Amino acid sequence: MRHLLAATLMLLAACSGGQTVSLTVDDAHYRPPLVDGGTGVAYFAITSKIADRIVAVSSPRARAVEIHESTSDQGMAVMELRPGVDLPPGKTVKFEPGGLHLMVIAPQPLTAGATFPIQIELESGRVQTIAFAGAPAS
């Protein structure tokens, strides 16, 4: 529930310019890298009321953020960079282990109790910042 509340508050703040909120984000959580300078990963579920497309992702706390998808090809696990992800109206798109996910490259360390911000840029021109709940790497 805490994950949903944080993500919802960030979405509301991003849309406070008279726009209606047309995105819902659930279970936004971030796994930091095991070693400094490594790669973290972020997972979430997103639902758009209108047809849209995620065209870019970024974070002020990382060198880069990329959309990746894990698949299986002839029994071998394959991870591919995706240029974007379609958001069909009313359908939930899940970013989860073994499928779509965000790779967070060279992120700054996360302190206890902090969230990790990731911006999602949509084809419609909207930009949403999502606060991903996480825990410091141990």
Regions found by a protein language model. Give the residues of each.
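Positively charged n-region of N-terminal signal peptides that target proteins for export
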Residues: M1-L4
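Bacterial signal peptide processing site
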Residues: C15-Q19
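Compact, glycine-rich, soluble single-domain proteins
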Residues: S22-S138
